[in-house]
Amino acid sequence: MLADELTTKARQLGVRHTATISGVKSVYYEYPSDGSSAETVVLIHGYRGNHRGLEAIGGGLGKYRVLMPDLPGFGESMELTGVHDLDAYANWLEQFLITLGADKTSHVVGHSFGSLVVGLYASRRSSKSVILINPVSAPALSGPRAFLTKITSAFYHLSRSLPEGFANWLLRSPIAVMVMSSVMAKTTNRSLRRWIHKQHLDNFSDFASVKVAAEAYDASISTDLSKMAYLITSPVLIIAAVLDDITSIQVQRDVAETYPNATVVELPNVGHLVHYEAPAEAAIHISAFVESNK
């Protein structure tokens, strides 16, 4: 199935829930199993995203119960009362899983910034399995497009010094969103590119405040998986796109060797947007890994 078809399939099944996690109202969506498996898969989205960004992958995981929260300050979830750093997000994830009784029984998936949140959580607690999609496995400023990352960093730091209204307009600017989307998308399929751009225009500005956007950005470049891989004892699947702009494929291969128990799957002709460009393939690999780690 195509990405838009998988997304539609998931949205038809999704049930909205709210829970108080880390003292704030948090929203998550549950996609019931078709009855063929009792396993639970939890998907954690990336920076400036929300649960909708991973629905195409969720649509390919129909045999499982799937949970997709909006991280604090993004989507429909309220922002935290303190700083939105990586430790706060990992603590929130831990409390989320405990509250839902899924801390010891779930397979936890993280994409991009979500891989850092899941990785830090997994370095402290074990899960049935951990799946990292295009994990941030090297310092952000040393990736294939380090120059663009430096410009982006300056962009977010500038936003902090501007009046709230202007900073909000700047960060949510459709032009800025389209530049990012155009750089990240690797597919040559025009229809898919248009769909990807629409997803970003609809969802990439879904953050609660300039404070959240700036603090979470700092969190996204504060560390990388190479610094915590050796602490993650759960079985790990790394789904790495060969054309990823954030972490090169060779770095993904090298860092994978430092996990106690990791498997790497490489996706050719795909970039950072695996969840849009190859969600069906990602779901197939996730399903196979879940089945081998029940």
PLM feature spans:
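Short beta-strand/loop motif that positions the catalytic acidic residue
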Residues: 232, 238-240, 244
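Conserved HGGG/HGGXW glycine-rich cap/lid loop of the alpha/beta-hydrolase fold
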Residues: 24-78
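Conserved alpha/beta-hydrolase "acid-adjacent" motif
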Residues: 245-251
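Catalytic active-site module of serine/aspartate enzymes centered on a nucleophile-bearing elbow/loop
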Residues: 260-294
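Conserved alpha/beta-hydrolase "nucleophile elbow" surrounding the catalytic nucleophile
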Residues: 45-47, 110-112, 241
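Flexible "cap/lid" loop of the alpha/beta hydrolase fold
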Residues: 130-164
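Active-site loop/oxyanion-hole signature of alpha/beta-hydrolase fold enzymes
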Residues: 24, 68-113, 143, 284
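Conserved alpha/beta-hydrolase catalytic His-Asp/Glu region
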Residues: 166-230
